[in-house]
UniProtKB/Swiss-Prot annotation:
The record marks Y91, E206, Y363 as: Cytoplasmic (distal) gate. Agmatine binds at I21, A94, C95, N99, I203, W291. This is Arginine/agmatine antiporter. The record marks W291 as: Middle gate. The lineage of its organism: Bacteria, Pseudomonadati, Pseudomonadota, Gammaproteobacteria, Enterobacterales. It comes from Yersinia pestis. Major component of the acid-resistance (AR) system allowing enteric pathogens to survive the acidic environment in the stomach. Exchanges extracellular arginine for its intracellular decarboxylation product agmatine (Agm) thereby expelling intracellular protons. Probably undergoes several conformational states in order to translocate the substrate across the membrane; keeps the substrate accessible to only 1 side of the membrane at a time by opening and closing 3 membrane-internal gates. Homodimer; each subunit has its own individual transport capacity. The gene is adiC.
Length: 444
């Protein structure tokens, strides 16, 4: 267990949640939404309602159960060790696979200043170096990594908040309305196409609860950080992407590789574009620290319960799962190097997409877990949280429906493989014969 001086307070963990949510995607969102048009504002409204509902689910369940591990801990408590094991493996995979995709984007922004980074071999080596830097910072301790991420998130917020607040001085209503709906679809179809982009934008809402073991006063701070992080991300997303849609004509915005950079150059000149690239790189690379932290924490929580190899639960004097973090570093390095060829890179793109779906399954389990764990503990808020949970359910399922068929298929295959792995894990940790004569209780 982490010592009190190593634990982190409310502001750093809130910024970690916001940084993990926004990550790299925020800087490309306006270009991705340009294929739909200004009507995307309605998609944002639907998405934010769903994301806030999900954040309130995590906030409430973490106030009832502050066990470290987040979704893993809730699934295990509500549904038993099998779904706990499944949740941990899915989430652990999603965290470190997502890091590999994120570091490539972050280093890509740095290529604005160092063109040599566009060379595949140099890019790969640089990515590996950054991955290990953040593994090392995590080993130093959670307080160090949250400080680094707080600085990185603050830097990333400079162009986002700048455009969100001051971009409106260059906003043209006619530019925005001229591309109100360029999707070729009706109103409902256009909003649905927007949701396929925006629903993914709040992945990371759960990260404060996963890191509960390293947070001071988790029953108070985790719920506040969860909802606060979502609200910060929501305001940044809507104001900045809407402002850019009114600054840059739709035809140009669709082709933009750096919408925030283009908007900054339009408003303040070329130097501003360089500043945006630097801030974007900081935001992407800084979020690596937070995702590495939660990957290590969910694995440690499961290992402590006998549902993951014991090595992931070994900690140093500060309570840091050093061995688990080193294993993460090795796995990320292997995958990073193996994705250097064009064919492998294409396959890894599929793996990255599948890993995002991996996070939705724990979300669904957590929604169900709240209604089970909260049974008899929600008082006069029962109806309120049933409604909130249903909204969060729809949010997650809609995100899965909007995914590609191939991604969903491989996610299902992974679930089947994890089922087989669980039997081996059970036999490894239980030396006695399976209790065939044990009575099965109703409701269990």
């Amino acid at each position: 267990m982490s010592t009190d001086d190593q634990k982190v307070g409310l502001i750093p963990v809130t910024l970690m949640v916001a940084g993990n949510i926004m990550g790299s995607g925020v800087f490309l969102l306006p270009a991705n939404l340009a294929s739909t048009g200004g009507i995307a504002i309605w998609g944002w409204l639907v998405t934010i309602i769903g994301a806030l509902a999900l954040s309130m689910v995590y906030a409430k369940i973490s106030s009832l159960d502050d066990s470290p591990g987040g979704s893993y801990a809730y699934a295990r408590r509500a549904f038993g060790p099998f779904l706990g094991y499944q949740t941990n493996v899915l989430y652990w995979l999603a965290c470190w696979i997502g890091n590999i995709a994120m570091v490539v984007i972050g280093v890509g922004y740095l290529s604005y200043f160092f063109p040599i980074l566009k060379e595949p071999m140099v890019l790969t080596i640089t990515c590996v170096v950054f991955l290990w830097i953040f593994v090392g910072l995590n080993i130093i301790g959670p307080k160090m990594i949250t400080r680094v991420q707080a600085v990185a998130t603050s830097l990333a917020l400079i162009p986002i908040v700048g455009i969100a607040l001051f971009g409106w001085f260059w906003f043209k209503g006619e530019t925005y309305m001229a591309a109100w709906n360029v999707s070729g679809l009706g109103t409902f179809g256009a909003i649905q196409s927007t949701l396929n982009v925006t629903l993914w934008s709040f992945i990371g809402v759960e990260t404060a609860s996963v890191a509960a073991g390293v947070v001071k006063n988790p029953k108070r701070n985790v719920p506040i950080a969860t909802v606060g992080g979502v609200l910060i991300a929501a305001v940044c997303y809507v104001l900045s992407s809407s402002a850019i849609m009114g600054m840059i004509p739709n035809a140009e915005l669709r082709l933009s590789a750096s919408p925030f950079g283009d908007a900054a150059r339009l408003a303040l000149g070329d130097t501003a574009g360089a500043v945006v690239s630097l801030c974007a790189a900081a935001g992407c690379l800084g979020s690596l620290g937070g995702w590495t932290l939660v990957a290590g924490q969910t694995a440690k929580a499961a290992a402590d319960d006998g549902l993951f190899p014991p090595i992931f639960g070994k900690v140093n004097k500060a309570g840091t799962p050093v061995a688990g973090l080193l294993i993460l570093g090795v796995l990320m390095t292997i995958f990073q190097i193996s994705s250097i060829s064009p064919n492998a890179a294409k396959e890894f793109g599929l793996v990255s997409s599948v890993s995002v779906i991996f996070t939705l399954v724990p979300y669904l389990y957590t929604c169900s877990a709240l209604l089970l764990v909260g049974h008899g503990h929600l008082g006069n808020q029962v109806k309120t949280y049933v409604g909130i949970t249903l909204i969060a359910f729809v949010y997650c399922i809609w995100a899965v429906v909007g995914s590609g068929a191939e991604e969903v298929m491989w996610s299902f295959v992974t679930l089947m493989v994890i089922t087989a792995l669980y039997t081996f894990n059970y036999n490894r940790t239980h030396k006695n014969p399976f209790p065939l004569d044990a009575p099965v209780k109703n409701g269990q």
